[in-house]
């Protein structure tokens, strides 16, 4: 019995308070104000929770665990799905959730805020971050600087941009001028395939400068924004007004199929096989019924058979 008694005494870390002391505490609480009672209860709760927390930390060791969210600051340590590797880099194929603060910055932030009660804590704004979390502010500014530097390095690494004299983006010159003219040519081909005649009018002054400056192939259209597309449809009823057209260049950048062809005065006869019967007669109606028609055909057959057989009877039709 003595052995068991000694073991039990050793196991209990703190002996329970005597019942008289508890009754005295309760009597004191009755005299105290509500705020003082709440503070006392909090202190007692903290004292009871501290040994439990220490045990958990000792037992966990190298286990994978995730800390809870503390007043808007999420701590995410360990090696889980959305966590970091040992060196602090994100593993390939695993994304870090947006707005997560990890590592030393998170520890500092939680350490600073331990003494402040949740009721009195200010909201997380830019000013409060500068005041209460200077480490976080530094980290975000450093990350932004690194991103800007990476973008600049990526731009400089391109060989075609290094060789250029003017640092104009490549897509600007390609897309900006040609978009309108490509649209015109597409529309022209669309209309040409459907039997409409298309004529393009171009600004000659701009074309001369462009032809001298840029070596363009013959089949390519001009790269100016001033290309005007006109579609001509035959309309004899309309009044024709004399239109003054600008003189064209000797070397045009317009495709051959877009140029207006001269209309031939002689009308071509359509090719086809001439019909041997009147097609209108097929649909004409008659007063004769089908029975009458088939009756006549039967009589004609009967006459033929009698004539072939050499019978004495003669049918008059």
From Swiss-Prot:
Residue numbers spanned by region Disordered: 1-26
Location of N-acetylmethionine modifications: 1
UniProtKB keywords: Acetylation, Isopeptide bond, mRNA transport, Nucleus, Phosphoprotein, RNA-binding, Transport, Ubl conjugation
Family, per entry: Belongs to the UIF family.
Modified residues (Phosphothreonine): 14
Cross-link (Glycyl lysine isopeptide (Lys-Gly) (interchain with G-Cter in SUMO2)): 260
Subunit relationships: Interacts with DDX39B/UAP56 and NXF1; interaction with DDX39B/UAP56 and NXF1 are mutually exclusive. Interacts with SSRP1; required for its recruitment to mRNAs. Interacts with CHTOP.
Motif UAP56-binding motif per record, residues: 26-44
Disulfide bonds: none
Protein name: UAP56-interacting factor
Single Gene Ontology MF annotation: mRNA binding
Subcellular location: Nucleus, Nucleoplasm; Nucleus speckle
Primary localization class, coarse: nucleus
Signal peptide: none
GO cellular component, one term: nucleolus
Alphabetized PANTHER family for the sequence: 40-2-3 PROTEIN-RELATED, UAP56-INTERACTING FACTOR
Alphabetized InterPro entries for the sequence: FYTTD1
Glycyl lysine isopeptide (Lys-Gly) (interchain with G-Cter in SUMO1) crosslink residues: 139
Phosphoserine PTM sites in chain numbering: 23, 60, 117
GO aspect biological process, one term: mRNA export from nucleus
Function: Required for mRNA export from the nucleus to the cytoplasm. Acts as an adapter that uses the DDX39B/UAP56-NFX1 pathway to ensure efficient mRNA export and delivering to the nuclear pore. Associates with spliced and unspliced mRNAs simultaneously with ALYREF/THOC4.
């Amino acid at each position: 019995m003595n052995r068991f008694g000694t073991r039990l005494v050793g196991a209990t870390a703190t002996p329970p308070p005597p019942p008289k002391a508890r009754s005295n505490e309760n009597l004191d609480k009755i005299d105290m104000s509500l705020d003082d009672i709440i503070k006392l209860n909090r202190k007692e709760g903290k004292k009871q929770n501290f040994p439990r927390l220490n045990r958990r930390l000792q037992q966990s060791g190298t286990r994978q665990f995730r800390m809870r969210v503390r007043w808007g600051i999420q701590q995410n340590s360990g090696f889980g799905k959305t966590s970091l590797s040992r060196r602090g880099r994100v593993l390939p194929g695993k994304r870090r959730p947006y707005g997560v603060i990890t590592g030393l910055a998170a520890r500092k932030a939680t350490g600073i805020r331990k003494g402040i009660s949740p009721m009195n804590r200010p909201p997380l704004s830019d000013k409060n971050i500068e005041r209460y979390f200077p480490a976080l502010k530094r980290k975000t500014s450093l990350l932004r600087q690194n991103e800007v530097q990476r973008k600049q390095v990526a731009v400089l690494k391109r060989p075609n941009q290094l060789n250029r004299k003017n640092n104009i983006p490549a897509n600007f010159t390609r897309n900006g001028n040609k978009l309108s003219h490509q649209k015109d040519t597409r529309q022209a081909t669309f209309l040409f395939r459907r039997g409409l005649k298309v004529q393009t009018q171009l600004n000659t002054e701009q074309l001369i400068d462009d032809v001298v400056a840029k070596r363009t192939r013959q089949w390519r259209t001009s790269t100016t924004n001033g290309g005007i597309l006109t579609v001509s449809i035959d309309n004899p009823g309309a009044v024709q007004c004399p239109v003054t057209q600008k003189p064209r260049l000797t070397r045009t950048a317009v495709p051959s199929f877009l140029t207006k062809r001269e209309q031939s005065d002689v009308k071509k006869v359509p090719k086809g096989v001439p019909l041997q019967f009147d097609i209108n007669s097929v649909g004409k109606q008659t007063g004769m019924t089908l029975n009458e028609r088939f009756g006549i055909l039967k009589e004609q057959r009967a006459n033929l058979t009698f004539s072939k057989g050499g019978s004495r009877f003669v049918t008059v039709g």
